């Protein structure tokens, strides 16, 4: 009974940690997502409503328009008259990517790409390291054999590259190879993960070592999430400026020219 209570306690703690990390990532993503939606709405309003209004006024006045104005007017006209084409392209790309990432090669390429993206890649690895070590510790502490525990952990991983590394590790462990070796050979997990596991293997204290690694990477995930958010905010604002400023200039430049001609 005491062993069962301990197992349930470990599983409960596991779920709490998972929920906390998931909530942290979702909470951190809310603000950037809102900013991106605002950019999309602002640009759509400017291109569909505001620019066409000024375009009709410029046509009435006549005269030569700056190149940037002509370019923005052309894009605006395309938005207004071919919006369904844009929606179809976006929907087609989304459907293609959704289907492609479900294929083995697509999932692997996408997983590899994500791991190479600055800030996002390290966050993914730290999240996977935290999840893997904590779940392994929980399962082993509940009496599950290492090979079986690795099989369950592998299925939990979302990144195909991480999943493949754990599949390979499971095969190696089933042949009697210590877990630390295939993890080190994979090139996916940070040195601290397999070094601490190696210490656990040598001392026979694997569960405690896994718990320590999980606790360390829990904090690392929080720090990496905050760093990613801090980097995304100014980047999104810069992208917004790069998109919106040319549109504003395209509208204002002919107006200033018109005012100058009237004043003259």
Please name every model-derived segment.
Residues 1-24, 121-231:
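Glycine- and small-hydrophobic-enriched helix-loop-helix hairpins
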Residues 20-99, 219-264:
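Bilayer-spanning, highly hydrophobic alpha-helical transmembrane segments
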Residues 60-63, 96-117:
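Juxtamembrane helix-loop transition segments at the membrane interface in multi-pass membrane proteins
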Residues 63-73, 111-128:
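Membrane-cytosol interface motif
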Residues 67, 71, 105, 109, ...:
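Short acidic-hydrophobic sequence patches enriched in Asp/Glu that either
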Residues 84-105, 139-156:
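Alpha-helical membrane-embedding segments
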Residues 118, 143, 254:
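Conserved functional loop/turn residues at catalytic and ligand-binding sites
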């Amino acid at each position: 009974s005491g062993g069962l209570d301990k197992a349930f306690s470990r599983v409960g703690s596991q779920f709490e940690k998972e929920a906390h990390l998931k909530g942290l990532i979702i909470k951190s993503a809310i603000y950037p997502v809102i900013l991106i939606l605002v950019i999309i709405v602002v640009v759509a309003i400017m291109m569909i409503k505001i620019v066409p209004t000024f375009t009709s006024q410029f046509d009435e006045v006549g005269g030569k328009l700056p190149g940037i104005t002509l370019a923005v007017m052309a894009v605006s006209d395309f938005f207004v008259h071919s919006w369904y084409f844009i929606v179809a392209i976006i929907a087609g790309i989304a459907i293609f990517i959704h289907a492609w990432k479900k294929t083995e090669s697509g999932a692997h390429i996408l997983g590899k790409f994500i791991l190479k993206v600055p800030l996002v890649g390290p966050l993914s690895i730290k999240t996977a390291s935290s999840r893997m070590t904590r779940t392994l510790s929980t399962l082993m502490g509940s009496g599950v054999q290492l090979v079986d525990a690795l099989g369950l952990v592998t299925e939990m991983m979302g990144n195909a590259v991480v999943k493949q590394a754990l599949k390979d590790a499971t095969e190696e462990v089933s042949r009697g190879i210590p877990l630390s070796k295939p993890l080190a050979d994979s090139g996916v997990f940070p040195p601290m993960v397999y070094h601490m596991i190696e210490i656990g293997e040598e001392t026979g204290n694997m569960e405690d070592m896994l718990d320590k690694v999980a606790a360390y990477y829990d904090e690392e995930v929080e720090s990496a999430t905050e760093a990613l958010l801090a980097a995304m905010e100014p980047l999104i604002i810069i992208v917004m400026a790069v998109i919106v400023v040319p549109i504003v200039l395209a509208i204002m430049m002919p107006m200033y020219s018109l005012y100058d001609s009237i004043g003259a």
